[in-house]
Curated annotation (Swiss-Prot):
UniProt family annotation: Belongs to the isocitrate and isopropylmalate dehydrogenases family. LeuB type 1 subfamily.
Pfam families: Iso_dh
InterPro entries found in the cross-reference section: IsoCit/isopropylmalate_DH_CS, IsoPropMal-DH-like_dom, Isopropylmalate_DH
Record flagged with keyword Nucleotide-binding: no
HAMAP family per record: LeuB_type1
Subcellular localization: Cytoplasm
Domain of life of the native organism: Bacteria
Listed name of the protein: 3-isopropylmalate dehydrogenase
Length: 357
């Protein structure tokens, strides 16, 4: 198999973690006789520094022509004073929109080796944490109309949370298909007691559910969901929600699993094209110090192999290699606990690589 992968190192620790993921992917390609062609793409703060814009047209074109995109992280305080249309984060929004990446898939799974790093009590952790958040990615308040105007002598700002029925239907089908292959439970999270857009979500999701009689659907207000994720996360299997709610809840879900450093994510289109990235930020405070955790990026690469390329066996090899490294007690600083062996970003990549080759 030959696949072309656009690689966005991005900012901060992005280059460090991506370097480790590429090392693993190259080993997988050699072992299973695949050809992965990697093409570096400028985006985010690095692109601003070099080209003056967060997402050069050349970068966008390369991503469109690729089979998948692998991203490290973008952003940092260095670019905080850039105008809103040219902030590093704007590159991500543009990529999602232009590539049609409407579905964000983010697992929240407690790795047993990291249970001590979770802030939750043992009585909660013992019930297990294993759910997926399916977040609509190119609609809602992030892409609605934004206004800043002066009315009666004072500034007034507004941001529109806009959704069409077709947008909701598309993401709902993704969630139901995922749930059908898991425990067949979906909780749709909204704020239907207040928001018209949430009421439309319920109307459309109810219709989609008619084609998935084997999947149990329930609804939960977002404020309650935020509480329940910490109080009783074992109740969840698949959470379906809109863009902003999903952004907030998925970050909350990541920390209860012990560390954001190990969590991957996928942003998918209607076809096989996807963008894969760890959920952590660019962490400029530790950039260049070999302290970053590469596991989230390595697992993102594993998701890419499975979801975009259909290479399930190869994906499982990477996942097992990560488990082996943790079983042996290797930990980066963010997940360190007593009795474990502290390693840096590069060494963690090397340890995982040993189980792949």
């Amino acid at each position: 198999m030959q696949k072309r992968i656009a690689v966005i190192y991005g900012d901060g620790i992005g280059k460090e973690v991506i370097t480790q993921a590429l090392k693993i992917l190259k080993a997988v390609a050699k072992k299973y006789e695949h050809t992965f062609i990697f093409e570096e793409v400028l985006a985010g703060g690095a692109a601003i520094d070099e080209c003056g814009e967060c997402l050069p047209m050349k970068s966008l074109q390369i991503c469109k022509q690729s089979d998948s995109v692998l991203l490290g992280a973008v952003g940092g305080p260095k670019w905080d004073n850039e105008p809103s249309h040219n902030r590093p984060e704007k590159a991500l929004l543009t990529l999602r929109k232009e590539l049609g990446l409407f579905a964000n898939i983010r697992p929240a799974t407690l790795l047993p080796q990291l249970s001590k790093a979770s802030p939750l009590k043992d009585e909660i952790l013992n019930r297990g944490i294993d759910f997926i958040i399916v977040r609509e990615l190119i609609g809602g308040v992030y892409f609605g109309e934004h206004k800043l105007e002066e009315i009666n002598g004072e500034k007034v700002a507004s941001d529109a949370m806009t959704y069409s029925a077709s947008q909701i239907e598309s993401i709902a089908k993704v969630a139901f298909n995922i749930a059908r292959n898991r425990k067949k439970e979906i909780v749709c999270v909204d704020k239907a007691n207040v928001l018209s857009s949430s009421r439309l979500w319920r109307e459309v999701v109810d219709k989609v559910a008619q084609n998935y009689k084997d999947v149990h659907l329930s609804y939960m207000y977002v404020d309650n969901a935020a509480m329940q994720i910490c109080r009783a996360p074992s109740q969840f299997d698949v959470i379906l929600t809109e863009n902003m709610f999903g952004d907030i809840l998925s970050d909350e879900a990541s920390i209860i699993t012990g560390t954001i450093g190990v969590i991957p994510s996928a942003s998918l289109s209607n076809g096989t094209l996807g963008m894969y990235e760890p959920i952590h930020g660019s962490a400029p405070d530790i950039a260049g110090q070999d302290k970053a955790n590469p596991i989230g990026t390595i697992l993102s690469a594993a998701m890419m192999l499975e979801l975009s390329f259909g290479l399930t066996k190869e994906s499982e090899v990477i996942q097992k290699a990560v488990q082996n490294a943790l079983d042996k007690g290797y930990r980066t600083g963010d997940m360190m606990s007593e009795g474990m062996q502290l390693v840096g970003c590069e060494q963690m990549g090397d340890v995982i690589l040993e189980s792949v080759i």
